[in-house]
Structures are given as structure tokens and as C-alpha cells.
Amino acid sequence: MFYSYPYKALSFPIQCVWLKLNGSWPLTESSRPWRSQSLLATAYIVWAWYVIASVGITISYQTAFLLNNLSDIIITTENCCTTFMGVLNFVRLIHLRLNQRKFRQLIENFSYEIWIPNSSKNNVAAECRRRMVTFSIMTSLLACLIIMYCVLPLVEIFFGPAFDAQNKPFPYKMIFPYDAQSSWIRYVMTYIFTSYAGICVVTTLFAEDTILGFFITYTCGQFHLLHQRIAGLFAGSNAELAESIQLERLKRIVEKHNNIISFAKRLEDFFNPILLANLMISSVLICMVGFQIVTGKNMFIGDYVKFIIYISSALSQLYVLCENGDALIKQSTLTAQILYECQWEGSDRIEIQSFTPTTKRIRNQIWFMILCSQQPVRITAFKFSTLSLQSFTAILSTSISYFTLLRSVYFDDEKKLD
């Protein structure tokens, strides 16, 4: 039923299982219900829309609470932390559901052009796997976060100092259009419904970020392999066959370079909306979580731990993505330097014979490649911002500015009340 990529040795990170569980993984062409009337495919699509609906409904409950408590800056900022994360991943879920064909084509293109098998006789695949460890750390932090949101209210119920049967806690601050406290059945069903919506939000966040990082990491790996091929461009060709061999090698290098650039553009095109929403919301989220940690009064110790994990996971998620985007920029621009250093200028020093001299035709092609390679390959958020460490520092700077402003407003209000 699920789309099976052409290259059988391709294995995605374990986090991607959650995209299948949340209904976001593309199905095969033959599994489409309007073509083969597959009951499993139909059930899967219905499940996918149920997940989206449950997240949307939970966000509406949180928004109702937010609007009802706008006058309290502490409650507002606390609620914004979960509401904004929900909105971000609600957008992600809808984007993945509405762009299944693009997602399928992206996976297919990756399997043919970018994937580096683990059995490859080079250390590039091992380096790519090593770089993916950072996404496991990010996943662990986010998993701890949602577990704390779902478990801490239960700890409060069973081990808290005082239990109010009419004001039982939920994973997040919400207002319902019905009385969720009227009976234990209603409470339990509402708790399970909203908790699972939160699980879908967090798992979609780390699963989609992981697959984006997976694509970028192996694209960087392909640039590394390309650099190795460029370094050996003029090795082992005799004088009679020099030009023909060099031209053939250069042709394959150009084709591979174009394929890598083409995949990076498809990757950017697919993840554009998600990255834009992520970068816009991240600065606000980091600001508000930091504000909660600094200004929280009479807060349960578990809530402090929860917010510390929250800000750690938000920072790690943003840093890992920006660092991978920065690595792609560096690897792509390094191509020009590798081309320049590949001994293409040998024809002016034929007497040295330390390597096969190049013809003017080959030099012209290499010069053109150097010119093209000076333009970095990068992933942007609709061209508004580039995924790079520079963007990461800019977002942190913006978050600190928001935090300073919010803190000033809060303490000014405190002084007026005193």
C-alpha cells in the first residue's frame, strides 16, 4: 500500500515511521482508491484526515482559552507555546496530505540520484549516518516533551496535594464547547483525544524535520563524492586518449552536478511552506518559553523541567536544520574551489609532464563550471530566509529582542499593581 521506493537498499530513518502512522506517507499509484478501490488506501486516507481534524479541533480549544485569558500575560504566553506549535504542525500535516504526488516524486528522485548505499566502498555513507545522530537527539528531546505534557496532569491528579473533581487538569490549557468535567468518561475520552492530537503534532515535527535533514545530509554526501571525481579528472589518461577521456569524465561530472542541483531545487520547492512557517514561529516560541522559565511563580517543579526541555528541543530543532542547510551551502560552493585546484592549467607547462595537459576546449568548460559553482545551492523559505547558521543567529537575536520587550511589559505591569 505504501509507496515502495525503486532502490530497495534505501532505508529511511526510524522517525519516518510516524509519518506513516499519522497518514502523511505517500501511497503507491495503484493504491489510490479512485483507481483500484483499495479499502486499505481509503481507510488510510480517512485516518489521515481524522488526524488533521483532531489536531485542528484541539487547536481551536486552545485558542478559545487563549482568547479568554488575553489580559493575563503569564497565562497567555504559556498557552501560546502549545498553540503555536500546534498551528505549525497543523500546517505541516495539511501540506503533506495535499502534496502526496510531489512527496512521492521527491522520494523517487532521491532514491535514484542521491542515496548512497551503506555498502559503498567509501566513508561518505558512514559520515552521513554519523551526521544523522543529531536528529536522534532532537527526537529524544521532543519525545520527552510530549510525554511530560501527557503524563504530568495525571501525576497531579494521583499525587497532587489537593484534587478538585470539578477542575481536573488536561495536557494543555483549553476551553471546551461542552462540560468535559461532568463525568469521568467524558474526561477520559477528552484527555485521550487531546493527548493523541499532541502526539501527532510532536511526532510530525521530528519525523518531517528528520526526513528533510536526511535528504540534505545525503545531498552533501553526493557533493563530497563529486569532489572526489573532480580531483581524479585528469588522472590515468595517456596523451593519445587524453582529451576524449577527459571530456567523457567531465560530461559525467557535469551531469551529476546538474542532478544534485536539480534535486536540491525540488527539495526546496517541496519544503518551502513548512520552513517559512517554522522560521516565523520559532522566534516567538523560544521567546515565550524563555519568558515562562524566567517569570514563572509558584510553578510545579515538573512544569519547570517541562519548559526547560521545551526550549532545549526548540533550539536543537532549529539549530540542526540550520546547520544542515549551512553544510549544503559550504559543500556546493566548495565545488568551485575543487575545480580550480584539479590541475586544469597543465597545458601551459607541458614540459613538466606531472599530469596530462588539458586542451583549451576542456579548460573553457571547467571555467564555466567554476563560474556556475560560485552560486551556492541552498534551501530557502520562499526566498524570505535561507536555512543557514546566519539565519539561526538572526532568529535567536529576534527572540531575545521579543523576550526583553515582553519582560519589560510584564515588570511594568507588576509595578503598577504594587
UniProtKB/Swiss-Prot annotation:
Q: Where in the cell is it found?
A: Cell membrane
Q: Give the CC-aspect GO terms.
A: cation channel complex; dendrite membrane; plasma membrane
Record-level Gene Ontology MF annotations? ionotropic olfactory receptor activity; odorant binding; olfactory receptor activity
Where do transmembrane segments lie in this chain? 39-59, 71-91, 141-161, 196-216, 274-294, 300-320, 386-406
Name the organs or tissues of expression.
Expressed in olfactory sensory neurons in the antenna.
List all topological domains (Extracellular): 60-70, 162-195, 295-299, 407-418
Return one Gene Ontology term, BP aspect: signal transduction
Q: Which residues lie on this side of the membrane: Cytoplasmic?
A: 1-38, 92-140, 217-273, 321-385
Q: How does it sit in the membrane?
A: Multi-pass membrane protein
Keywords, ordered alphabetically? Cell membrane, Glycoprotein, Membrane, Olfaction, Receptor, Sensory transduction, Transducer, Transmembrane, Transmembrane helix
Q: Which residues form a coiled coil?
A: none
| One Pfam assignment | 7tm_6
Known InterPro entries for this protein?
A: 7tm6_olfct_rcpt
Glycan-linked positions: N69
Instruction: Provide the assembly information.
Output: Interacts with Orco. Complexes exist early in the endomembrane system in olfactory sensory neurons (OSNs), coupling these complexes to the conserved ciliary trafficking pathway.
**Which protein family is it in?**
Belongs to the insect chemoreceptor superfamily. Heteromeric odorant receptor channel (TC 1.A.69) family. Or1a subfamily.
* Role of this protein: Odorant receptor which mediates acceptance or avoidance behavior, depending on its substrates. The odorant receptor repertoire encodes a large collection of odor stimuli that vary widely in identity, intensity, and duration. May form a complex with Orco to form odorant-sensing units, providing sensitive and prolonged odorant signaling and calcium permeability. Involved in the behavioral responses to octanol, nonanol, and pentyl acetate.
Q: What else is known?
A: The atypical heteromeric and topological design of the odorant receptors appears to be an insect-specific solution for odor recognition, making the OR/Orco complex an attractive target for the development of highly selective insect repellents to disrupt olfactory-mediated host-seeking behaviors of insect disease vectors. Odor-evoked OR currents are independent of known G-protein-coupled second messenger pathways.
Output this protein's name.
Answer: Odorant receptor 13a
Give the species this sequence originates from: Drosophila melanogaster
Gene coding for it: Or13a
